[in-house]
Amino acid sequence: FLFLYCYEFIFLLFLKRRLGKEEFFMDLMKGKKGIIFGVSNTHGIAYGIAKQLFDEGADIAFTYAGEAMEKRVKPIAESMNAKLIMSCDVTKEEEVEAVFKECEKIYGKLDFVVHAVAFAPKEDLMGRFVDTSKEGWDIALGVSAYSLVRVCRHAEPLMNEGSSIFALTYLGSVLSVPSYNVMGVAKAALESAMRFLAVDLGSKGIRVNCLSSGPVKTLASMGIAGFSKMLKAATMRAPMKRNVSLEDVGKAGLYLASDLSSGTTGEVIYVDCGCHSAYASAEEMDVISKAE
């Protein structure tokens, strides 16, 4: 028996070396069906995740927010052979419910759901946080945080045992980040909601997590005042001395969506080259010393 085990192990190592690790781990998501809320273009984090899942064999449904986004999302979804491409305003109960009813008709059961939806009025991302409007607060938390609760409620009956739901968050949930303001509060609420959802759904074998990416140059992020400085600061502080790529984040999304994360729930998984773990880099301390 031991001989056979060793032989099998050596054979697997041979295959890995012969094929290369990318080919060796192909089809990790074969037979898995799921939906992604929030893909908007080919430069965003949600797309990076979708690409990794599709390349590993996943069958993905897509939603988009309104007619304007349909022109961007439809070609992406079609390139990934999507069976379902549907408009969905996550602030409307009936639209989220309708999406999952269509999922049930087409797929029956689901294995993963990705929540990549966030929004706050631009004026509430600028200036001082103390000047946040009540309307901006309600919009930011409704779209960016409560929508995860709504999505999970309608997804729950369709999720297979051992399935995964995860949402995108950011370090601004636990640290004050310039020009992030009310969105930081929304992401903090999202992460807290995730933990309660993980407890609610865990007994049914459904995992719920958050994926916290470092700053990535996307169309959305470039609209944030001073974002280029955020990128430089993240590079300086990160132990790996670089920013994350869409591929980095996509691979982490693949981990959370696949059976590789079968024992992980209620967690915030950071993919930021270690930026969240460092108080300050040596370079930053030098700058401070010179300023004294």
Language model segments and positions:
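A conserved structural motif in NAD(P)-dependent oxidoreductases
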Residues: A238-V249, L260
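Conserved mid-core segment of classical short-chain dehydrogenase/reductases
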Residues: C88, K92-E97, K101, K105-I106, ...
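A short hydrophobic alpha-helix cap/turn motif
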Residues: F54, G108, M159-E161, V199-K204, ...
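Short C-terminal tail/terminal secondary-structure segment
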Residues: L254, T265-E292
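Short, flexible catalytic-loop segment of classical short-chain dehydrogenase/reductase
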Residues: V208, S212-G223
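Canonical Rossmann dinucleotide-binding motif of NAD(H)/NADP(H)-dependent dehydrogenases/reductases
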Residues: D27-F62
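Catalytic loop of short-chain dehydrogenase/reductase
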Residues: G38-Y47, A118-R153, E161-S203, P215-K217, ...
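Short, small/polar-rich loop/turn modules that mediate ligand/substrate recognition or access, typified
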Residues: G202, R207, T264-G266
